[in-house]
Amino acid sequence: AKMTAGRIVQKLCDDYVVNLSADTIEDCVEAGKELFSEYKPRDWDDDKDASQLDICQMSFTDVLKNALEGLNEAQNKLRINKLTGEEDLMFQVPGLELEYNGRPDFSGQIELKTTWASVANTKSGKRSSSIPTQPTWSHLCQVAGYWAMKRKPQAIVYANENNFRVFTEENCEKLSAEALQNIWNHMVTKCRIRENLLKSADTIQDLLGLVEPDFSHMWAWDIHPDALNEAKKLWRFV
């Protein structure tokens, strides 16, 4: 539900500031309600996803407003005249055989990240989300890829129901050109290793024998139990 909520907020931001197809915030909110109604909660987690959906629906209006404020601040900081929406980037990287793919959210320079309260065994039934004091590693890796192609300054906007925070190279050293180059070098090395693994394996089973799965990862294996069991069989864990 959280991932869907994030996509909905991004689409509503697109409608309001990029496509100009929504005249008011209220129009966006009504469109958001319609989009949420189309989501079908997963049916294998004891209704946790359904409860999470309720939480996201109750707070998405505030998250949207904070996201829009954050985007406006980021646009001004990066001196972008007019925002464009998400684009699909494919580019060749020296030393790699496969093209690199990325999808920046706005103008190839701004990445929007929403954080949502979670289902919890508390009186309110939820646990509030927080905005990071520094960008997370995975988000830095994302924008490093966009920087590598565009060679333009990057911003990361975090928004929740209470506030927003904008990171640029002005207040975050990790978004400087030098830091992004170092992160990009790290990513290219990892991509090269993965390409070598793919080339060295003749079959899927050969490839699985070269990669150690982390089934204890906090979210990577948060999938349907049948699919998880099938994966464990492929790796011969069961």
Predicted regions and their residues:
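Flexible, glycine- and charge-enriched loops at secondary-structure boundaries
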Residues: 2, 132-136, 173, 177-180
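Hydrophobic/aromatic-lined pockets within catalytic cores
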Residues: 13-21, 114-117, 148-151
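A structural signal for short, well-ordered beta-strand segments and their strand-loop junctions
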Residues: 84, 108-112, 154-158
